[in-house]
């Protein structure tokens, strides 16, 4: 296992804990703010050093494109991983493919298959996996083909990444409530945000993202 400097270990721990608590890695700016760096570029240099030591993987062009490659103790599993994964505590989760208009997201016809995943990688137990389509959440480290682990919920706090139903479509976005309206925020400047007026549009929350499984390996 690579030997990390004390600062590198602190940054690795921040990445791991942020993924564990929110389901997603921190941005360079968030790392810089946490450690008092003068700019995100300083955080980037530390991340590159961690990548060279083989403990993380960086996704070019994504502000949250950080993936843990190793655990730092025998009792830990990586917070983001590729299937299949062996473990003592296993969850069997349905993988939701395309969702037909007007039908429940977990309707039998939407289930592509069942996956077994290690329960220890999630602080909150997910109810299902949703295959991500497109790159609208790229800068949150969520890429086309990834599997998003989702806990069923009809309400969510501001700032959470959610699965939302808007009319006939199901989308993954960051939730923000403003002045009686709801904004579904894309994490990619190439995609527009979506404004929703409750009561005027068919809108519902289907769940909150609690983790991510990379598409590589299956």
Curated annotation (Swiss-Prot):
Active site: 136, 173
Site for Cleavage, residues: 101-102
Record InterPro entries: LexA (IPR006200), LexA-like (IPR039418), LexA/Signal_pep-like_sf (IPR036286), LexA_DNA-bd_dom (IPR006199), LexA_repressor (IPR050077), Peptidase_S24_LexA (IPR006197), Peptidase_S24_S26A/B/C (IPR015927), WH-like_DNA-bd_sf (IPR036388)
Coiled coil spans: none
Keyword Hydrolase among UniProt keywords: yes
Gene Ontology biological-process entries: DNA repair; DNA replication; negative regulation of DNA-templated transcription; proteolysis; SOS response
Keywords assigned: Autocatalytic cleavage, DNA damage, DNA repair, DNA replication, DNA-binding, Hydrolase, Repressor, SOS response, Transcription, Transcription regulation
Residue ranges for the DNA-binding region feature of this UniProt entry: 28-48
Enzyme class, spelled out: hydrolase
GO molecular function per UniProt: DNA binding; serine-type endopeptidase activity
Superkingdom field: Bacteria
Transcription among keywords: yes
EC number from the UniProt entry: 3.4.21.88
Stored Pfam families: LexA_DNA_bind, Peptidase_S24
Reaction(s) the record says it catalyses: Hydrolysis of Ala-|-Gly bond in repressor LexA
Function per UniProt: Represses a number of genes involved in the response to DNA damage (SOS response), including recA and lexA. In the presence of single-stranded DNA, RecA interacts with LexA causing an autocatalytic cleavage which disrupts the DNA-binding part of LexA, leading to derepression of the SOS regulon and eventually DNA repair.
Assigned protein family: Belongs to the peptidase S24 family.
Assembly information from the UniProt record: Homodimer.
Name of this protein: LexA repressor
């Amino acid at each position: 296992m690579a030997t990390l400097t004390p600062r590198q270990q602190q940054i690795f721990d921040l990445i791991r804990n942020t993924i564990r608590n929110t389901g997603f890695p921190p941005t360079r700016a968030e790392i810089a703010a946490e450690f008092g760096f003068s700019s995100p570029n300083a955080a980037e240099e530390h991340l590159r050093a961690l990548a060279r030591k083989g403990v993380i993987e960086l996704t070019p062009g994504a502000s949250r494109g950080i993936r843990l490659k190793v655990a730092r103790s025998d009792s830990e599993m990586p917070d983001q991983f590729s299937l299949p994964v062996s473990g003592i505590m296993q969850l069997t989760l349905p993988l939701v493919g395309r969702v037909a208009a007007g039908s429940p997201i977990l309707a039998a016809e939407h289930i592509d298959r069942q996956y077994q995943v290690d329960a220890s990688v999630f602080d909150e137990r997910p109810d299902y996996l949703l295959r991500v389509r497109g790159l609208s959440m790229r800068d949150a480290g969520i890429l086309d083909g990834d599997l998003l682990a989702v806990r069923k919920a009809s309400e969510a706090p501001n700032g959470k990444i959610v699965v939302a139903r808007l009319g006939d479509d199901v989308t993954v976005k960051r939730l923000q409530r403003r002045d009686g309206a709801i904004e579904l925020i894309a994490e990619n400047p190439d995609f527009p945000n979506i404004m929703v007026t409750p009561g005027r549009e068919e809108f519902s929350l289907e769940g909150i993202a609690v983790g991510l499984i990379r598409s590589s390996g299956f």
